[in-house]
Amino acid sequence: MKGEANMSENYNDKNIKKILESENVPQELKPESIKIMLDKFSGERKIKINFKRTAMRVIPIAAAFAVTVSAAFGYMLKYNHDGDKCLVSESSLNDADSVDSMKYAADYSEVYNYFKLAEKKASRIKSNGYDEVMADGVIAEDSVEYSVQEEEVNQNSVNVSSQQKKAYSDTYNQETGVLEADIVKTDGNNIYYACGNVINAANVKDGKFLNTIQFHKDEEAINDMYLYNNILIVISSANNFSENVNYGEENDCCGLIYNDTCISFYTSGEYPQLIGTYTQEGSYNDVRLTDNGYLYLVSNTEKYYSSKDFTSEEFEKYIPRYSVNQEVKYVEPDCIMIPEYCPDVLYSSSAFANISAFNLNAETPYEPTDIQSVAGFSGTVYCSYENLYLTFGYEDTEITRFSINSGKITPQASGKVKGYVNDQFSMSEYNGYLRIATTVNMRNNSWNGVFGDSQDYNNYLYVLDMELREAGKIKDFGLDETIKSVNFQGDTAYIVTFRQTDPLYAIDLSDPHNPVIMDEFKINGYSSYMQKWSDNLLLGFGQSADNDGTLTGVKLTMFDNTDPENLSALDTVEINADYEHEYVSSEAVWERKAMLIDPEKNIIGFPVTEDSYYSSENKNESYYIFYSYKDGHFNYLNKIQNDMEYDAFNRAIIIGDYVYMLSGLQFKSADMATLSNVESVEF
């Protein structure tokens, strides 16, 4: 229901004026300082947009730098034991400002007043001369797949028990009981593979393709899928352009990009049928599904309207929207959290992180059981069985913990740590603590640091309690290097950093208040992903490099962690370029789900692309390659070629005694015993 304003317009204006007049513009944000830096560094820089997992911002570049590293989630709350009011949660950074408390809005007008105040703060800065040096641009902040553990489980547990009960592989789950989405799913009889805006499906048996269809075929690009309780859940993104609107100042107009995250619910089987749809405003961030059937979806919303263009009664212009079977609704005010005080950031738009929950066991699984919208953005998402963590930031990372229980989302605590997280595997909840590894750019206050030209890095591993207060930390490892991958196994963390070599650190976390480095093992190249192979073996996959740190191809390494104080590499396999004009790459370097890892069946597979550039001709070879591991050595099994132009396998799954390689244009099957081709089908 639309709310009425609690205060008159004149009263608000007086308060806004009082706040604005009391603030000073920082020296580094004065127009002359920004102009010097932009003249030096911005030039013709291209700005990349990743529509899959981004917190998207269409704002002037100079203002973007001030906003991007701000504490977007520094305003989270924790409840007191009575649950009656919000309390400020102490920051994990000893030298950081305390985190402002948040509250649920009483009505929509309170949300309107908050963003109007933020807009006027931004307008004040612009009127002081910033418009002379601002250039319109787009910044897309990566939320790299972008964190995970259980008691002696987590991403490190092999998750064999559930797979032993079925004769087909599934997406590797980093946290036991928390299921991961992917672009391929199977029920053992049918394969569903998402490519662009289409789902390629095949009914299979014993390596044969009995029937194939294509469905979905909407305008939205498919991001992820789940297969649960005979329901196929398809998550996709729709990117749209709005009409020109005023942006803050009179006659200052722009066309805006806005995104929706869509979920389509289908029956599973050979011929899926649509049973319902849900649309949530905002760009898709991430999703999780607990094994009891509750799905949690995260998106980021940002609207760009000047408050001059609408009144508080026009709530549809600033309140997050969602729809069930195309029936449009708006998030209720008592589900919208805003800071009690306007933050010192340059918000000139209404930005929210939206979290929705669904019960997939219900008769209408497309009806949300809960929706929470929080002022700010979300980046990397990590989920344990009982808690969902949202992070955001670069110079500092803001962390917010939400409890999740049977489709109910409840904000609990927030905190802050130095640096940025590499991906979701950089975090682990274990025995009442959250462990989080970060990289700090020690020159990130300089413009060299902003543009990524600095090599001055430090790395931290924090241990936080459930109120996200610091219990312990260790730092100063991997100096001048950045974290590439993290693997937590119980009380031990394994962290890979890289600049020239690949140090693998083993860190003892048995005393949460006093983490200790047990060993540092160096090897050329780096592992971008690590997964437990067995109790004493750690599998690493990443990029190979020479002694100077120049990347040469991809590699597979088996580490012996029997004694964490004496790490070693038992075997390494590299696929490198042979000539100067060759390039070897693998999607698995940045997307670990492209790998097939099955310790029970003793098989490891990943896609490889080899490009050759010569004066006479260019050559491209794409294949999926397989290895086994036995007695301290990798053994080459075979590689399945993809002979179609401009196509590459990027997934493989096992059903029974057969493995299926998948791409956007074709499926291929092979006998597990010999890994020889059985059949292929094109789409």
Which residue ranges define each predicted feature?
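N-terminal cationic amphipathic segment used for targeting or macromolecule association
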Residues: 3, 60-64, 69, 133, ...
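Beta-sheet-rich non-transmembrane sensory/scaffold domains
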Residues: 78, 82-683
